C-alpha cells in the first residue's frame, strides 16, 4: 500500500461513526438516526413528524410538536462482508467478516417556545466506517485495521410562517477520531521482486535491499496513524403542509470542512524511501505529523408524506449527495512537503426510498419500506477497507404507545449489496456484503 492509500483512509477517519464504526449507506455515510426511520427504510424522513428523531433530518419539523418531546435509542448493525482473491505471490486473500458489529446510538430533544417558534437538539452520526483484517493477512498493506468514529452534535430552531409554511435551521459540530494500522502481509516479497526487475536490482545495494524486503515479516507494522479533530457545518429545512394529511419537505445539509491532524509512523527502514516503491513512507519507527483537509459532501433531500386513509399513509424520499466534491486528498508534513496527492474521483450519488405506515389503533403502529443506495465510488477507486457497492434495503417496524406520553419504536432492516471486483495496489479482490440492522428507541412527551 502506498502512503497515498494510507492517508486516503486517514481522511475517512475524519468522517465516520458516532460511538459506532459502520457505514451502511452509500460511500461512508450513515442514516441510522432513529429506529422508527429504520423500520420504513428512512423514507419520507423530512416530512414525517412521529417522533423527535425526525428533527435531526429536517429542523422545520420542530413546528409540528406542541409539547417537549424526547427520544433516545440505538441501532445495532450486524454486517457480513467477505473478501476473496489470490495475491501475485500465490497466497490467499480470503477474509470473512471484515466488518465488525457495532451500535449506533442516537438522542433527540424538541421543545416548542410558542405557536411560531421552537428549538431542538440531537446527538447522532452522519458518517461511519470500520474494517478489520488479521495482522498476518497477505493483503495487509491495503487491509489492516481501520477504526474510525464521529459524533454529530446538532442545535436547531424553527419558525412557522403560517398554517402551510415552516422553516428550520441547524448548526452541526462533528467530532472525529481514528486509528489506522497497516501490516506488511506479502508486500515485502512483491517489493523484492520489483526491485530485482528494475535497474536497481543489478547493483549490490539494490540486491541487498531486495533481500531485506523479502525478509520482512507479514505482521510488520508498515503504517500507523491516529488523530482527532472537530469540523463544523449547518443544515436547513422547509416544510409545506397542504393540509393535516399531506406535507412535503426540502432539506439541505452543508459541506463540512475538517482540518485533520494525525501522527504517522512506519516500522520500515528509511532506505526503502529512495527507490520509489509502492509502500508507505518509511520512518524507521519514528513518528511524524501529517495534515489533511477533508470536505464532507453536501446533501439535498426531497420528502413527502400522504395520509391517504385514516389508517394508511405513504411516504417517500429522494436524496442527492454531492460526492463529486470528494475529488482528491492531499496530505502535507509540518514543513509543508507533500506527503501524497491522490485523485479520488467520486461521483454524485442518490438514494431513493418508499414506505407505508398502518395506524392500527391508538396503541399500535406498523410500518415498512424499501430503498436503494447508489454507490458514489467508481469501480477503479474501490478499496477493501471501504468495499462500497450499490445496496438494496428491505425494512419493517412498529411503535407501541403505552399512553399519550410514552412509546417505544422497534425497527429491522435487511441490506443486500451487489458483488463487486476491487483492484487495489498489486491485488485483485472480489467482495460481497449484506447486513442486518436492528433498532429500538424510547419516546416521551412531557
UniProtKB/Swiss-Prot annotation:
Question: What InterPro entries does the record tag this protein with?
Answer: OMPP1/FadL/TodX
Q: Where is the signal peptide?
A: 1-25
What are the recorded GO MF terms, alphabetically? Answer: long-chain fatty acid transporting porin activity
- Source organism, top-level taxon: Bacteria
Q: Where in the cell is it found?
A: Cell outer membrane
Q: How does it sit in the membrane?
A: Multi-pass membrane protein
Q: Name one GO cellular component term.
A: cell outer membrane
Q: Which SUPFAM superfamilies match?
A: Porins (SSF56935)
Primary localization: membrane
Keywords recorded for this protein, A-Z? Cell outer membrane, Lipid transport, Membrane, Signal, Transmembrane, Transmembrane beta strand, Transport
Short name of one Pfam family: Toluene_X
The text of the family note is: Belongs to the OmpP1/FadL family.
Q: What is the purpose of this protein?
A: Involved in translocation of long-chain fatty acids across the outer membrane. FadL may form a specific channel.
How is this protein named in the record?
Answer: Long-chain fatty acid transport protein
Naturally occurring in which organism (per UniProt): Shigella flexneri
Q: Gene name on record?
A: fadL
Amino acid at each position: 500500500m502506498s502512503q497515498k492509500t494510507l492517508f486516503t483512509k486517514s481522511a475517512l477517519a475524519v468522517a465516520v461513526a458516532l460511538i459506532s464504526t459502520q457505514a451502511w449507506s452509500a460511500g461512508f455515510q450513515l442514516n441510522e438516526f432513529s429506529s422508527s426511520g429504520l423500520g420504513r427504510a428512512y423514507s419520507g424522513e423530512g416530512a414525517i413528524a412521529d417522533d423527535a428523531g425526525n428533527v435531526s433530518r429536517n429542523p422545520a419539523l420542530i413546528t409540528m410538536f406542541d409539547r417537549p418531546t424526547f427520544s433516545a435509542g440505538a441501532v445495532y448493525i450486524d454486517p457480513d462482508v467477505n473478501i476473496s482473491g489470490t495475491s501475485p505471490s500465490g497466497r490467499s486473500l480470503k477474509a470473512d467478516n471484515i466488518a465488525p458489529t457495532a451500535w449506533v446510538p442516537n438522542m433527540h430533544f424538541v421543545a416548542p417556545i410558542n405557536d411560531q417558534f421552537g428549538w431542538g437538539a440531537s446527538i447522532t452520526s452522519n458518517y461511519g466506517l470500520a474494517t478489520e483484517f488479521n495482522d498476518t493477512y497477505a493483503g495487509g498493506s491495503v487491509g489492516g485495521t481501520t477504526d474510525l468514529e464521529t459524533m454529530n452534535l446538532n442545535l436547531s430552531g424553527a419558525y412557522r410562517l403560517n398554517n402551510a409554511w415552516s422553516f428550520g435551521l441547524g448548526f452541526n459540530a462533528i467530532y472525529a477520531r481514528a486509528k489506522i494500522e497497516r501490516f506488511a502481509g506479502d508486500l515485502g516479497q512483491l517489493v523484492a521482486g520489483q526491485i530485482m526487475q528494475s535497474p536497481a536490482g543489478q547493483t549490490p545495494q539494490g540486491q541487498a535491499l531486495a533481500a531485506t524486503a523479502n525478509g520482512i515479516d507479514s505482521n510488520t507494522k508498515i503504517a500507523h496513524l491516529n488523530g482527532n479533530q472537530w469540523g463544523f457545518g449547518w443544515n436547513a429545512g422547509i416544510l409545506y403542509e397542504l393540509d393535516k394529511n399531506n406535507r412535503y419537505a426540502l432539506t439541505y445539509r452543508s459541506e463540512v470542512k475538517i482540518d485533520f491532524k494525525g501522527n504517522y509512523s512506519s516500522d520500515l527502514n528509511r532506505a526503502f524511501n529512495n527507490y520509489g516503491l509502492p509502500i508507505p513512507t518509511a520512518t524507521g519507527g519514528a513518528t511524524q505529523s501529517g495534515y489533511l483537509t477533508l470536505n464532507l459532501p453536501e446533501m439535498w433531500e426531497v420528502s413527502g408524506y400522504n395520509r391517504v386513509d385514516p389508517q394508511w399513509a405513504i411516504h417517500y424520499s429522494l436524496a442527492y449527495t454531492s460526492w463529486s466534491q470528494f475529488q482528491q486528498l492531499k496530505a502535507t508534513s509540518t514543513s509543508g512537503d507533500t506527503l501524497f496527492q491522490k485523485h479520488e474521483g467520486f461521483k454524485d450519488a442518490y438514494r431513493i426510498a418508499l414506505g407505508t405506515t398502518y395506524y392500527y389503533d391508538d396503541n399500535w403502529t406498523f410500518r415498512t419500506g424499501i430503498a436503494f443506495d447508489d454507490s458514489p465510488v467508481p469501480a477503479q477507486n474501490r478499496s477493501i477497507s471501504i468495499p462500497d457497492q450499490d445496496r438494496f434495503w428491505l425494512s419493517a417496524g412498529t411503535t407501541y404507545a403505552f399512553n399519550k406520553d410514552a412509546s417505544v419504536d422497534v425497527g429491522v432492516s435487511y441490506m443486500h449489496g451487489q458483488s463487486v471486483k476491487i483492484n487495489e495496489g498489486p491485488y485483485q479482490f472480489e467482495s460481497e456484503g449484506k447486513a442486518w440492522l436492528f433498532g429500538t428507541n424510547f419516546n416521551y412527551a412531557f
